[in-house]
Amino acid sequence: MRKFIIASGGTGGHFYPGFSLGKELRKRSYEVLFVVRKEDAAIKTLTKNNFNYKEINFTGFPRSANPIRHIIFCYKFIVSFWQTLGIINAFKPDVCVGMGGYLSFPVIVWAKIKGIKSAVHDSNTKIGLANKICAKFTNIFLLGLPTSDNIKNTKLVGTPIREEFGLDFNREEVLKSRGLNPNLATVLIFGGSQGSKKLNMAISKTAKKIVKKNDTVQFVHISGDKGYDKLRQEYRGCKNIRLFAYCHDIYFLMRAADFVVCRSGASTIAELYACRKPAVLIPFPYAADNHQYYNGMLLKKAGCAELFVEGDNLAPKLHEYIAGISKNKNILEFMERGYEMLELPDPLKSAEIIADTVESL
């Protein structure tokens, strides 16, 4: 039986593509071991799904000048580097796969030193620092999105998303179950795992103004736990607006919506692509290397999304744009066709494509 190590964790954007790959490799009767950060939130999901894992005490390179942070980084780097060697020596993998982020680094470097085949996956169009370094040591570099960065031996494979996005569903039932009217145009709003107060408030102002003047559109806002109480006060008495702290089946709600307002992380981009949903993208302004901006620009250039930078004028810009398209369905149809220009791999098949690739190493 062939053995695979998958370094995956830190954020949902790095973990869930790796988790999808792990499930696909297990279907093929391979043994899979995950390497994750110590006390990673991903451990709960791995345990629930009976995956073996090992923890390393690693952290990302500090981007501040604080010397204490650099000292802590150096200490954790040395410790985790040797932890990783112990994991590899004990498990004896045939292939190591890094799914992006700093966790990939020690795994991919040791794979190179020990002559083990490896692959690295980056979901973003702007390649991260750790992955740029890993690219020098790996056999093949797998791209979630096209990139202009100078990386050798690449293959465009897409970013895996949850298989639930491919399930059959009934739009009317999905909307009615949330107190929404299936006869109205539906705008879905969510901020991702790094949703912010500024984004929530700008969008709430927009939604309130639009429903006062237009009774043919409704909003469903997934706020996150932190923003929920404040927004509940904001939306009190507003018609055609539904607020939820969390949505466990966003895969149905996104497909039921006519339009989406969201961040532009790589997993969200892949989900929008799979659903062919017109969108307004508001990049998380503190993302490393501003990668969400570049992800969003890919969709904007194809005509399937608009992009606004988070700032003081966000609320009026959102209001003007969404109010305009809510009156013109032809714009939405044009934006949906824009996805055809991208010609990306099907995110619902990306896990299979990646598994085929690493299987062949």
Swiss-Prot record:
Binding site for UDP-N-acetyl-alpha-D-glucosamine: T11, G12, G13, N124, R162, S193, Q292
Biological or metabolic pathway of the protein: Cell wall biogenesis; peptidoglycan biosynthesis
Compartments, record wording: Cell inner membrane
GO biological process, one term: regulation of cell shape
Protein name, as recorded: UDP-N-acetylglucosamine--N-acetylmuramyl-(pentapeptide) pyrophosphoryl-undecaprenol N-acetylglucosamine transferase
Any one Gene Ontology molecular-function term assigned to this protein's record: UDP-N-acetyl-D-glucosamine:N-acetylmuramoyl-L-alanyl-D-glutamyl-meso-2,6-diaminopimelyl-D-alanyl-D-alanine-diphosphoundecaprenol 4-beta-N-acetylglucosaminlytransferase activity
PANTHER family from the UniProt entry: GLYCOSYLTRANSFERASE, UDP-N-ACETYLGLUCOSAMINE--N-ACETYLMURAMYL-(PENTAPEPTIDE) PYROPHOSPHORYL-UNDECAPRENOL N-ACETYLGLUCOSAMINE TRANSFERASE 1
Gene3D superfamilies linked to this entry: Glycogen Phosphorylase B
Protein family according to the UniProt entry: Belongs to the glycosyltransferase 28 family. MurG subfamily.
Pfam families in UniProt: Glyco_tran_28_C (PF04101), Glyco_transf_28 (PF03033)
InterPro entries, alphabetized: GlcNAc_MurG, Glyco_trans_28_C, GlycoTrans_28_N
Primary localisation category: membrane
Membrane topology: Peripheral membrane protein
Gene name for this UniProt entry: murG
Keyword hit for Protease: no
GO CC terms of this entry: plasma membrane
Substrates-to-products reaction catalysed: di-trans,octa-cis-undecaprenyl diphospho-N-acetyl-alpha-D-muramoyl-L-alanyl-D-glutamyl-meso-2,6-diaminopimeloyl-D-alanyl-D-alanine + UDP-N-acetyl-alpha-D-glucosamine = di-trans,octa-cis-undecaprenyl diphospho-[N-acetyl-alpha-D-glucosaminyl-(1->4)]-N-acetyl-alpha-D-muramoyl-L-alanyl-D-glutamyl-meso-2,6-diaminopimeloyl-D-alanyl-D-alanine + UDP + H(+)
Purpose: Cell wall formation. Catalyzes the transfer of a GlcNAc subunit on undecaprenyl-pyrophosphoryl-MurNAc-pentapeptide (lipid intermediate I) to form undecaprenyl-pyrophosphoryl-MurNAc-(pentapeptide)GlcNAc (lipid intermediate II).
Enzyme class: transferase
UniProt keyword annotations, A-Z: Cell cycle, Cell division, Cell inner membrane, Cell membrane, Cell shape, Cell wall biogenesis/degradation, Glycosyltransferase, Membrane, Peptidoglycan synthesis, Transferase
Keyword Coiled coil (UniProt): no
Enzyme Commission designation: 2.4.1.227
